[in-house]
Swiss-Prot record:
The modification N6-(pyridoxal phosphate)lysine is found at residue 285. One of its GO terms (molecular function) is carbon-sulfur lyase activity. The keyword DNA-binding does not apply. This is Tryptophan aminotransferase-related protein 4. The gene is TAR4.
Length: 463
């Protein structure tokens, strides 16, 4: 009898030990199964240095044939490892690729990484029947709250494939707000303006919309009759000159669309939280991820929101679920410390570039840069300079009528002022590309300014 009791007790104890061991092992140790290959592949490709002048990517050429992805070199660098710099290579200062933030994200490799399963959200819609990730909507509202650049209360949040799609959706929605008017709505903006506004209006060639151009000229003309439906696009900070803008037009016939793609601490003092009826923002100028093609809008009026939403559904059936997951992870990193790391890095980087640029142009009598008075920034809690994405350069000599061609002859490709509705005496130079691009731009600018008649060569020694 005692022997049976002992055996029973031993059996119970062993079962308890095994149960505790299994529970403890399961809760404290986890071994990945299906993620091993993908993680190893990503880590391997990320380890390719490409001499610091390029990047390798998991979707690079040759991977389908079992080859290692090649280094994709920065502009003016060549070779298998991007180690060879081409002499007198033309500089690309045209594109607004925000690669200046790439070093920040490389430092955040672990926090920003995601691994997507092959069956991730295969449905068209989320559980609530929409095309919108509610978690992403929440983190976007939090982002604006911590930065203090926009009011999100009592606003609908709409997603699009970049602000390019949202711009088309917004203009479409606003042009349909008064169907009783037979003539098309006029699309207006301030000069210099972002060319996409004109390009989209003319490309879609809608019976409901006509690009008219300069808002100030319209206001002073006899056509400003308070009857013709008008849509004014206000870009603030402005592209190309970086200045804060306000609406020029008002009246019962005027609808205003605000493009705040550049209203982030990288580029501008955050002077106040904007509180508009319709505002657009872009991931590309927030985190630098232009290739993700993601933007969002804050819309006060439900009817306008519904028209925009219908436009998005009919043209793309929402934004990719993988994109929304990626953006969610990126913005979680941003808001995790109130944006301090990324905005301090971004502002510091662009500020240094402007300091270098100003030193060069201060020696020139042939070229001048835009000037913007410093303002108090509520985000950084100090008065600070504007640090725009672009240099808006003016050729001052009477004979220099085409500034773009003058810079192109100096092997600097900018963007012609006439693209922005302005004079050809202006050219836009991008300051937000990679450090390699900026270094090459500075080298070419030194040569250009150096050849001015009245600039002593010793002035360049400390730039």
């Amino acid at each position: 009898m005692m022997q049976k009791k002992l055996l029973l007790i031993v059996s119970i104890i062993l079962n308890l030990v095994f149960t505790i061991h299994i529970l403890y092992y399961s809760s404290t140790t986890w071994n990945p199964t299906w993620t091993n290959r993908a993680a190893a592949e990503a880590e391997t490709v990320a380890s390719f240095s490409c001499s610091g002048h390029g990047r390798a990517f998991v979707d690079g050429l040759g991977v389908l044939d079992g080859q290692k992805p090649p280094c994709e070199c920065n502009n003016c660098y060549i070779g298998k490892d991007c180690s060879v710099l081409l002499k007198d290579c033309p500089v690309d200062a045209n594109s607004g690729d925000p690669l200046f933030l790439e070093p920040f994200w490389m430092r955040q490799a672990e926090r920003s990484a995601i691994l997507v399963s092959g069956w991730h959200r295969m449905s068209y819609i989320y559980e609530d029947g929409t095309y919108v990730s509610r978690e992403l909507e929440k983190v976007i509202r939090k982002l604006h709250s911590v930065v203090g650049n926009a009011v999100t209360d009592n606003r609908f949040v709409i997603f699009g494939s970049g602000t390019t799609q949202l711009l088309a959706a917004a203009v479409h929605a606003l042009s349909l707000t008064n169907s009783s008017v037979s003539s098309p709505a006029r699309l207006l903006t301030s000069i210099p303006y972002y060319a996409m506004y004109k390009d989209q209006a003319e490309f879609f060639d809608s019976a409901h919309l006509k690009f008219e151009g300069n808002a100030s000229a319209w206001k002073q003309s006899g056509r400003n009759d308070n009857i013709t439906q008008v849509i004014e696009v206000v870009t603030s900070p402005n592209n190309p000159d970086g200045k804060l803008k306000r609406a020029v037009l008002d009246g019962p016939n005027v609808k205003t669309l605000h493009d705040y793609a550049y209203y982030w601490p990288h580029f501008s003092p955050i002077t106040h939280p904007v509180d508009e009826d319709l505002s657009l923002f872009s991931l590309s100028k927030t985190t630098g991820h232009a290739g993700s093609r993601f933007g969002w809008g804050l819309v006060k009026d439900k009817a306008i929101y519904e028209k925009m939403d219908r436009f998005i559904r009919l043209t793309s059936m929402g934004v990719s679920k993988e994109t929304q997951l990626h953006v969610l992870q990126l913005l979680k990193v941003v808001v995790g410390d109130g944006g301090n790391e990324i905005f301090s890095f971004g502002y510091g980087t662009v500020k240094k570039r402007w300091e270098t640029l100003n030193k060069i142009f201060s020696m020139s009598t042939r070229f001048s840069l835009q000037t913007i008075k410093p303002e108090y920034c509520n985000y950084f809690k100090k008065v600070r300079e504007f640090t725009p994405s672009y240099a808006w350069v003016k050729c001052e000599r009477p004979e220099d009528t085409n500034c773009y061609e003058i810079f192109r002859a100096a092997k600097i490709t900018g963007r012609n002022g006439n693209v922005f509705g302005s004079e050809e005496r202006f050219v836009r130079l991008s300051l937000i590309r990679s450090q390699d691009d900026f270094d090459q731009l500075i080298a070419m600018l030194k040569k250009l300014v150096y050849h001015e008649e009245d600039v002593p060569s010793e002035n360049f020694m400390y730039i």
